[in-house]
């Protein structure tokens, strides 16, 4: 931006015009130069402090007001603004100390409110409550403050009533609407929460078109709106983050990501900790390296979202970075007791132990599972009693309690089973699942994993169908919402139990849905039917029928521009490498026409695979593959060279 030239005598008018238009950054640019010339200028410092405060830059605002309190100790307002700026900058001890300088009776109520807010920020809720109770009950903030304290005590319904009561008195306020939505979210009443969120967003769009809501999602390139006081007062950032959290909980992952891109645009360095955390979490599948960097960065900030610590550790375990998880736990022992529940700590401890002492880990998981089983039995009894007494309110609460305990039990059970799964001891995995039958038989994750373990045992395809079928039928009208590997395993199970018609019908259904999507979006790659055919081809190759199996694999990747991807190449190359191994051992002979077909296939992969990654590298991998080697083109050339060598065609 070129330097602005302002005529003498127009400085004040220009600066005030900028402030009126909300151009605080431009005003700061001019005022900073003025302050450098006149370091004790009351006007420059006062306006700078005001602009910094409105841009939510509380640290710089506090510096301005600190100087003003020293230059003009008689002005009570500067002392108040200094304390408020320190509070905004999360410098709670300094903010509390500065409130004691407020000695004017007119600012006494403001001082009490600020001290209560500081105690609340320090998580001293009893101290905050003592101060709030000193406020007159007719004060509009009294119920709001009590609502916040009730929320922290887990009294979500009572907190909600306080916020609603305040809204009736004060009229509509976005921050109160957000507080009500947050209470409903905590009560798992997502529809009610979304209703209040929708109103915040609709009002934001209507009243503040300059905030560019939804523009980023639509692909429009817009400049950052910055962290202004206006943005803060709209509660839009909080509302979009809460909407993203709800959609994420409901497993509507695309909608969750859209909620984050719909919020008013800001540059990455302007993002608040909650948005940064949610971006990391919700883009983890596509940008895991960035996700880990953001979460690790947040741990160094003060404050950071309380769930950051646990989420970073869980994600390290998910991506099998157990050493990193152990290091983070060891280096942040002070955070362990504050941010991890006993359940989560024990779960993470067992996960990390798995790598060095699987038997010890199994024992830890078993102990944890035992505690949760006891809780499930206790809550089951409470559910039965509530049903018997026709106590609908208690029944609703106990069913919710049961679901919460079950959601803790399932990961423990799966982690326990994975120890034996990794050893390919599938019968033991089946026994572990059988033990949990009474609690988990209606849970989709449990049913899916039971299906997988039955499928892996070769002689239990019929039983596997019994678990796969309900999952597929549940989503039959939107069959592409089902994982491709589930559809593939069900088709294989049908084939292995001579139910070829059912397999063909399922494949026709998948093909029909894929054709519809291709019609609506011709450039979109869809791999479901391709993976089903690849798995069937792999099955025939595993049974030694390479002629048919390889032919099926080749046909499944046509057309290559739509079907060749990292996952599909993974399945295809396994079949070709298995074929080459058996040919090299002289265990099978291939007809020349089939060899020719294989060479042509690899040449097509070479042609279309230039921009397709051969493997997805681990996000925190230090020794990265050469970019030219991690392509389908490179690997298909290698396999083609092996074909020439094994068949002698290059001689």
Curated annotation (Swiss-Prot):
The TPR repeats extend over 8-41, 42-75, 140-173, 175-207, 379-410, 411-443, 445-478, 530-563
Tell me which GO cellular component terms the UniProt record holds. axonemal microtubule; cilium; intraciliary transport particle B; motile cilium
Cite the Pfam families for this sequence.
Answer: TPR_2, TPR_6
A GO biological process of this protein is:
establishment of planar polarity
Question: Keyword Transferase, does the record have it?
Answer: no
How would you summarize where this protein is expressed among tissues? Localizes to the cilia of many ciliated epithelial cell types including pronephric cells, olfactory placode, the brain ventricle and lateral line organs.
Which compartments is it annotated to reside in?
A: Cell projection, Cilium
Q: Name one GO molecular function term.
A: intraciliary transport particle B binding
Cite the entry's keywords alphabetically. Answer: Cell projection, Cilium, Cilium biogenesis/degradation, Coiled coil, Repeat, TPR repeat
The reply to whether Repeat figures as a keyword in the UniProt entry is yes
**Sections of the chain in a coiled coil:** 494-521
Superkingdom of source: Eukaryota
In terms of one coarse class, where is the protein primarily found? other
Instruction: Please explain the role this protein plays, according to its UniProt record.
Output: Plays a role in anterograde intraflagellar transport (IFT), the process by which cilia precursors are transported from the base of the cilium to the site of their incorporation at the tip. Required for polyglutamylation of axonemal tubulin, which is a prerequisite for correct assembly of cilia and for normal cilia beat amplitude. Does not seem to be required for neuronal microtubule polyglutamylation.
Q: What protein family does this chain belong to?
A: Belongs to the TTC30/dfy-1/fleer family.
Q: What is the protein's given name?
A: Intraflagellar transport protein 70A
Q: What is the lineage of its organism?
A: Eukaryota, Metazoa, Chordata, Craniata, Vertebrata
